[in-house]
Amino acid sequence: MTTLKNDRYLKALLREPVDMTPVWMMRQAGRYLPEYKATRAEAGDFMSLCRNADLACEVTLQPLRRYELDAAILFSDILTIPDAMGLGLTFGAGEGPKFDRPIETKSAVENLPIPDPEQELQYVMNAVRTIRRELNGEVPLIGFSGSPWTLATYMVEGGSTKAFTKIKKMMYAEPKLLHKLLDKVADSVVLYLNAQIKAGAQAVMIFDTWGGVLGHREYLDFSLQYMHKIVNGLIRENDGRKVPVTLFTKGGGLWLDAIADTGCDAIGLDWTVNLAQAKAQVGHKVALQGNMDPSVLYAAPERIEQEVRSILADFGEGSGHVFNLGHGIHQDVPVESPKVFVDAIHQYSKPYHK
């Protein structure tokens, strides 16, 4: 087993005792950091940054040099899998992702390959291995993937969307076709995350960014069912240590019981959920991650500290809480604000862990 100098993140995910509440931030390696912008400029474009193991490692480590974070998260993108399937991913300057060859027909679904993670996605595994080496046991490394539903929205829509008309048209008019697509993507995610774990990821997270746009039955059938399949297929122990799995559906507060029943170790919460209620509902089954509104980081230090203390009080005593934002950090927050956030969590959480 690799020795970890700080394992409180992994312990909290498994609801084991910790000395203080661990914290990391979604998108902690990103555009709010001037050093990230410099490294991205050096890479040339976003996907070149992802594909260069040394530069991906550098941006993964940047936030850890500034803030006392309890975990590192692999720098990559959720759209690596559809890109490896041959859909032709591009990021225009100042624009969101676009696919040159979106999924529009039955034959497109049938001909979709399942990528070999150590071939088409080897650059991701190289990044994981490089980051693990450079972390040198300081904190654990989180691997991740998008959820099948969320990946399928981009694959069918051809990029970002606010209306979700194409994917929902397929869902209601051709449900069998969408299930076939989701099944293929789920199989790909299992292979991808297991390869990350073998390469050195010590925990994994599935980002279901768009699950919250679905109705109740549709969420269970078209999103959660496939995350459940992934959870069942994952390596749950590696290098003599359990590998915790976190599921995060943005807008998923209505489905906490169903998410907990997948057998995941933790549920990520957005800021619309009350942490005390979530703990009362599912805290006996899973750990909880979250859930400060990222926009609080625009506020004065005292207001950030106040929000941290409120959320800590909502969770109350005991382990099983990983502090995080309710979604990714905004790109224009002051770089001093995350330090206030992280330090406040460590300072004010200690009494809850006696």
Curated annotation (Swiss-Prot):
The keyword Secreted belongs to this UniProt entry's keyword annotation? no
- Cystine crosslinks: none
Write the record's keywords in alphabetical order, separated by commas: Cytoplasm, Decarboxylase, Lyase, Porphyrin biosynthesis
Mind telling me which Pfam families this protein's record contains? URO-D
Q: Name one GO biological process term.
A: protoporphyrinogen IX biosynthetic process from glutamate
Q: Which GO CC terms are listed, alphabetically?
A: cytosol
Under catalytic activity, the entry for this protein gives:
uroporphyrinogen III + 4 H(+) = coproporphyrinogen III + 4 CO2
What's the top EC group for this one? Answer: lyase
Q: Which PROSITE patterns match?
A: UROD_1, UROD_2
Q: In this UniProt entry, which residues are annotated as the site Transition state stabilizer?
A: 77
Gene Ontology MF terms: uroporphyrinogen decarboxylase activity
InterPro entries hit by this protein: UROD/MetE-like_sf, Uroporphyrinogen_deCO2ase_HemE, Uroporphyrinogen_deCOase
The pathway to which it is assigned is: Porphyrin-containing compound metabolism; protoporphyrin-IX biosynthesis; coproporphyrinogen-III from 5-aminolevulinate: step 4/4
- Residues binding substrate, per UniProt: 27-31, 77, 154, 209, 327
This enzyme's EC code(s): 4.1.1.37
Q: Does Isomerase appear among the keywords?
A: no
Q: Where in the cell is it found?
A: Cytoplasm
| HAMAP family per record | URO_D
Similarity comment: Belongs to the uroporphyrinogen decarboxylase family.
Q: What does this protein do?
A: Catalyzes the decarboxylation of four acetate groups of uroporphyrinogen-III to yield coproporphyrinogen-III.
This protein's assembly is summarised as: Homodimer.
This chain's protein is named Uroporphyrinogen decarboxylase
Which organism was this protein described from?
Mannheimia succiniciproducens (strain KCTC 0769BP / MBEL55E)
Species lineage, top-down?
Bacteria, Pseudomonadati, Pseudomonadota, Gammaproteobacteria, Pasteurellales
